[in-house]
Regions:
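Single, function-defining residue in the core of a domain
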Residues: 1-10, 14-41, 45-182
């Protein structure tokens, strides 16, 4: 028992977890279809039929090192996801990973001011001004990743961030991630 105590322990906390994983919060949502369109206002359009999808949306925040939601909220399926991104719920040095539905420059500014790191995929239609552009190459001269410092402008908000573009070898694509400027 003594040799395997950490593996056999009933303590559910993970031992040996990287420190940054303990700081990572993942925000996501999923839609549960209920009653077709009879009761709930639809969200989006089905790509084949063009009909709207009704139901409820489950929004959750998960501590990555625990794998269990720490915040779960239910809304109509048509509710915009960005309400879940509440900067006051996050502390200095925490990392928040979220999808494109959560892009909100005012909230990104608040997160940056609080010292919270955020990472999200970039929407294709975002407009920005490039301030710095640097391509990092491997020894063979191929791009490993590209780092751009940019300014996103919306109304009176000027949010400085960085865009990281890397090559996804499995998919043959170049996904773009947005993160605060660190």
């Amino acid at each position: 028992y003594a040799a395997n105590k950490n593996l056999l322990s009933s303590d559910s906390r993970r031992n040996g977890t990287e420190e940054w994983i303990k700081q990572l919060r993942i925000i996501d949502s999923t839609t549960i279809t209920l009653f077709s369109n009879a009761i709930f206002k639809g969200v989006g359009r089905h790509p084949r039929t063009g009909k709207k999808k009704g139901g409820i949306k489950v929004h959750s925040v998960i501590h990555a090192n625990e794998g269990v939601p720490c915040d779960v909220q239910f809304t109509s399926a048509a509710t915009n996801d960005s309400f879940m991104l509440a900067p006051s719920h996050y502390n200095h040095n925490e990392i928040v990973a979220l999808d494109r539905a959560y892009i909100n420059y005012a909230k990104f500014e608040e997160l940056t001011d609080r010292g919270v790191v955020y990472v999200t995929k970039m929407k294709k239609n975002l407009s920005y001004e490039i301030m710095v552009d640097c391509i990092h190459q491997n020894p063979e001269g191929l791009m490993e990743y590209r780092e751009q410092v940019v300014v996103f402008r919306k109304g009176d908000i000027n949010h400085i961030a960085r865009i990281i573009t890397y090559v996804d070898i499995k998919k043959g694509k170049k996904p773009k991630l947005i993160s605060l400027l660190t």
